[in-house]
Regions:
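Short acidic, glycine/serine/threonine-rich loops at helix termini
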Residues: 13-15, 37-38, 55-60, 98-100, ...
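Charged (often Lys/Glu-rich) extended helix/loop segments that serve as interaction or gating elements
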Residues: 148, 160-294
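Short, electropositive alpha-helical surface patch
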Residues: 97-111, 139-150, 180-190
């Protein structure tokens, strides 16, 4: 287990120690002092900044040390008699540039060399996540990112004794595991420029699973059951169930006409959806049903 949040509540550091969770990341001097105080025998992993300009979700504005800062942090860790065993990075969510992994791995090797100069025996590389959950989520095929990672590791880490690489591909595993099924609970029809325009009120919205629209940059593809291929399409807006007008799922999309009680669905919807749903306005998150296919 690696405690991969670079900035941790002191109570959580103490709890990690009681559970024998020794591996944890850091990216600043303050964190080193906390670890020294609450978990002095931790195995530390230094998180570095990356070039995440090609990613939809950018993390380096919040986490990670520059190479210059990394050198100072390694020296500080040495003076505090703390053990740094490796380097971590995250190229950002939904990475569309495979070369970002190459650059980050190259920079990680520079940090390994800094550690060696200070008597640190580094052997762990955590390449984070950033992998797409399904094919339509990234401009770069998953295989291309894998090749860039493997080539870079072969180039920059082929001489590190007992070298170990780990990753955190959360979206990659979670996305395809869930299909969201949600229901039309209300309907309005307007005439706009001589054409019908439908507004539907659904039993889930941005305070539920569709929070991913606001916080994860997702653009869900909504489909309806029992729709024929040649059904006429109409301009459509879908709202969530709450009293907030911001609770809008789609606006101006083209869908067939739906009825109250009709069911819609979104495939590949397991990542950063239900996990962040809330009870806002008294609406509870939707229930999850598990289906085993044989």
């Amino acid at each position: 287990i690696i405690y991969a949040n670079p900035v941790k509540d002191p109570h959580y550091i103490k709890f990690a120690r009681t559970q024998n969770v020794d591996m944890m990341t850091f990216d600043c001097e303050c964190e080193l002092y906390k670890v020294k105080l609450y978990h002095p025998y931790a195995k530390l992993v230094l998180r570095i900044k990356t070039d995440d300009s090609g990613s939809v979700l950018k993390f380096s504005t919040k986490f990670g040390a520059s190479l210059e800062e990394a050198k100072t942090l390694i020296e500080k860790a040495k003076s505090l008699e703390l053990d740094i065993i490796g380097v971590s990075f995250h190229v950002g969510g939904k990475c569309n540039d495979a070369s970002a992994y190459t650059k980050a791995i190259k920079n990680a090797r520079e940090v390994f060399d800094m550690g060696k100069q200070n008597g640190m025996n580094m052997y762990l590389l955590d390449i984070g996540g950033g992998f797409p959950g399904h094919e339509s989520e990234s401009e770069v095929p998953f295989e291309e990112s894998c090749k860039a990672i493997n080539d870079a590791i072969d180039t920059y880490f082929n001489d590190i004794p007992n070298f170990r690489a780990i990753a955190e591909p959360g979206r990659f595993f979670a996305s395809k595991s869930h299909t969201l099924v949600f229901n039309v609970i209300g309907k309005k029809k307007q005439i706009v420029n001589g054409e019908p325009y439908f507004s539907y009120y659904m039993n889930d919205g941005i305070y539920g699973c569709f929070n991913c629209i606001m916080f994860d940059g997702q653009k869900p593809e909504i489909k309806a059951f029992h729709i024929k291929e040649n059904d006429k399409l109409y301009k459509t807006t879908m709202f969530g169930p709450t009293c907030d007008s911001v609770d809008t799922i789609i606006r101006g999309a083209e869908l067939p006409e739906l009825c109250v009680g009709e069911w819609c669905f979104v495939e590949n919807f397991g990542a950063y959806t239900q996990a962040a749903a809330s009870n806002f306005n008294g609406f509870t998150p939707i229930e999850c049903f598990y289906i085993l296919r044989y």
